[in-house]
Amino acid sequence: MSKKKEEAKALRTPIVAVLGHVDHGKTTLLDRIRKSKVVAKEAGGITQHIGATEVPLDVIKQICKDIWKVEVKIPGLLFIDTPGHKAFTNLRRRGGALADLAILIVDINEGFKPQTEEALSILRTFKTPFVVAANKIDRIPGWQSHEDTPFMKSYAMQEDFAKQNLENRLYNLIAELYQRGFSAERFDRISDFTRTVAVVPISALKGEGIPELLLILVGLAQRYLEKNLRLHIEGKGRGTVLEVKEERGLGVTCDAILYDGTLKVGDRIAIAGKDEVIVTNVKAILKPPPVREMRVESKFQSVKSVTAAAGIKIVAPNLENVLAGSEFEVVESEEDIKKFEERVRKEYEEIAIRTDEEGVVLKTDTLGSLEALINELRQEGIPIKKAEVGDVDKRDVVDASANKDELNKVVLAFNVKLLPGVEEEAKKYGVRIFSHEIIYTLIESFVKWREEERLARERQKVEALIKPGKIKLLKEFIFRRSKPAIVGVRVLAGELRRGVDLIKPDGTKVGAVRTMQKEGKNVAIASAGDELAIAIEDVTIGRQLEGDEELYVDVPERHAKVIERDLLDSLDEETKRAFKEFLEIKRKDNPFWGK
């Protein structure tokens, strides 16, 4: 065998994750690649895997024939198309992402949506290189589609009006990526693909732009990922579990991606379970039938062995407690099992160990989602008391209730069930449960609630403070001189509340406001500009007061300190001035008063 052939064989198929918001075109893109005219000619050229589609290099070359200029060693591309969030959060392996590359599909006309945000945050967590497919260019006003044509060729045939519409949408999309910390540009304007995210305008429906999209993926894999694609063909099989599900007639099975080595029927494998490492023997390895028959569900082809990279279904005993998102490995000895157990334990600790004494309780469906959510919560500065995989039980509620801060008495549940009695327990202990199937939405709703609660508490604190106020006694409205003195006043600045003490400009205490009446009705509070009658205790007009003075609300020292430190900017100018005058009165004898 020539050296060149050996090299080609030594590189495994790169794994490409296809991510994006629902209805933005993930399935349409893969369907288009599967059903392109080329594929029809090369009967059976594309292999359908469990949760994945393998596109060999020959097919990619045919699709890209008009623009193919590169010498390539990789055998093709394996696209992972597991539905829903699982495609995001389970695509993990030790030391990062299971996917070597990703396509982030965004509807160019709609821009970013919650699942787009989620996909980006996971790509960031796992440091996965990605390309943005700006889909649905066929819906841009004025755009004339040319089926299966490279984007640049189609773009050259468009009217200026359509080109401008495309550029405007691209500009918005690139700006959205930039706001999230990614430098991006249209693919043909990039010189260094390691520093800038390539944006490829495509129509998954019409096939436009798909040649460039595939070419860029192949180029990125070939140029920047070659080291990661070295394959130990004879080595032990290693992979990641995408989903654990029951199949009629087979029992509980694992859908998995084999990313290294070879897996054979009869191999002994170790997989991370919910409470312990599960060691079992592979009874069967299943793959779907060829593409042309793939719509026939429930029919699988049994194979004796499989080499990476591949999407497979593993049939084996004792898979009930396997964790989706966890790794599996072929083990040949007790020592192998011990090493695997130690690695799993360390990995789980690395993900969940950095917990805080005070913080929220986090429960997720997989290790991948746990890792992604911890990362997102840390970025938001939210403390985490406990982070685990599994359904929410009463113990989680009790743990959350033990927090001192009410804002941390929270359970965040991502794509897991609330076990019976949990909601009643939460009501009993005053614990809030947030549950959602989209990471971005779960965190957004929690952060929004937390901020609203924090502001409500601040408002309550502010409400409880005695605020600054300045009043003028109206001499022509002295209704009673003593026991209590009743006099008309005008509020000059700030506010006047029932029960506050009053002082003179020289600091002499006057007495407390017992009651307040405005237009014959009792009131508890009056604001600047109001005129009303007030009853003042322990004072006689004509002795302690003349009846035409300006008086200040005697703000307690503790309250004055908070107002000066935290609330000064929220006061209007008149109130601010009155408060400063009040502080000067107090600090005449004691310069450190209220500091």
Swiss-Prot record:
The protein's name: Probable translation initiation factor IF-2
**Key word Protein biosynthesis present:** yes
Question: Protein biosynthesis: is it a keyword of this entry?
Answer: yes
Q: Which InterPro entries match?
A: EFTU-type, P-loop_NTPase, Small_GTP-bd, T_Tr_GTP-bd_dom, TF_aIF-2_arc, TIF_IF2, TIF_IF2_dom3, TIF_IF2_dom3_sf
Specify where the region named G4 lies, as residue ranges: 135-138
User: What are the annotated GO cellular component locations?
Assistant: cytoplasm
Pfam short name (any one): IF-2
Give the protein's biological function.
Function in general translation initiation by promoting the binding of the formylmethionine-tRNA to ribosomes. Seems to function along with eIF-2.
Report residue spans for region: G5.
203-205
Please give the residue ranges the record annotates as the region G3.
Answer: 81-84
Which family does the record assign? Belongs to the TRAFAC class translation factor GTPase superfamily. Classic translation factor GTPase family. IF-2 subfamily.
Region described as G1: 20-27
Q: Which PANTHER family match?
A: EUKARYOTIC TRANSLATION INITIATION FACTOR 5B (PTHR43381:SF4), TRANSLATION INITIATION FACTOR IF-2-RELATED (PTHR43381)
Q: Which stretches make up the tr-type G domain?
A: 11-225
Q: Where does GTP bind?
A: 20-27, 81-85, 135-138
Q: Which UniProt keywords apply?
A: GTP-binding, Initiation factor, Nucleotide-binding, Protein biosynthesis
Q: Which GO terms describe its molecular function?
A: GTP binding; GTPase activity; translation initiation factor activity
According to the record, the residues making up region (G2) are 45-49
